């Protein structure tokens, strides 16, 4: 097993919210070439002064993406307690559908709007590095979902977050190439209003 300072995973000095600046994969490659299974401590790095830093929320996922990029991995698999990425929160919407593939842009938007499957920093780093991420359950054996450059076609992703103070308020994220158009924005709002949904903000 290796800690961040042994690799090293170099970061800036923003303790508690450090940004990864560089990963030297040479030590890991040597261990892999020797036939060893390498376990790396996530969520941490080392700054230019040699001080240990922590990456903050989503730091473990971000560490995994950074390591995958440094190793030129074909794919990164993140095991979690969910079966993948769904069209909406299955705890709120029982009919939520698992997405086979979702684009980096869509996943980044979902993460920024409250979906808690992946942190937005890890998604942004994966997109910049071209690392596909497979998200799957460690319990069910589901195929999970792949976050990659080109997702499957779906315009309305669905409910991503429900506020804790009211059960009647939800955030809905609509994605798609046509959505910046005012005409399409009006069409989405009109469809919601016809369904009896009051639009609070856009």
Segments (PLM) and residue ranges:
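Nucleotide/pyrophosphate-binding catalytic subdomain
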Residues: 1-118, 122-123
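Short linear Ser/Thr-Pro motifs
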Residues: 60-63, 137, 198
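A conserved active-site cap/scaffold subdomain adjacent to cofactor or substrate pockets
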Residues: 103-148, 154
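A conserved regulatory-domain signal marking ACT and ACT-like small-molecule sensing domains
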Residues: 144-202
């Amino acid at each position: 097993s290796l800690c961040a300072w042994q690799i090293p995973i170099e970061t800036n000095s923003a303790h508690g919210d450090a940004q990864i600046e560089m990963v030297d994969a040479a030590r890991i490659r040597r261990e892999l070439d020797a036939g060893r299974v390498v376990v790396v401590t996530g969520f941490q790095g080392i700054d230019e002064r040699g001080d240990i830093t922590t990456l903050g929320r989503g730091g473990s996922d971000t560490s995994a993406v950074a390591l995958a990029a440094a190793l030129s991995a074909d794919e990164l698999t993140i095991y979690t307690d969910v079966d993948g990425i769904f069209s909406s929160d299955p705890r709120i919407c029982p009919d939520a559908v698992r997405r086979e593939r979702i684009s980096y842009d869509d996943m980044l938007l979902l993460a920024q709007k409250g979906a808690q499957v992946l942190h937005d920093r890890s998604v942004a780093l994966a997109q910049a590095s071209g690392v596909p991420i497979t998200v799957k359950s460690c319990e069910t054996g589901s195929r999970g979902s792949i976050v990659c450059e080109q997702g499957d076609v779906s315009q309305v992703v669905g409910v991503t977050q429900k506020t804790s103070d009211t059960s009647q308020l939800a955030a809905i994220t609509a994605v798609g190439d046509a959505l910046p158009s005012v005409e399409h924005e009006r069409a989405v709002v009109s469809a919601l209003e016809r369904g009896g949904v009051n639009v609070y903000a856009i």
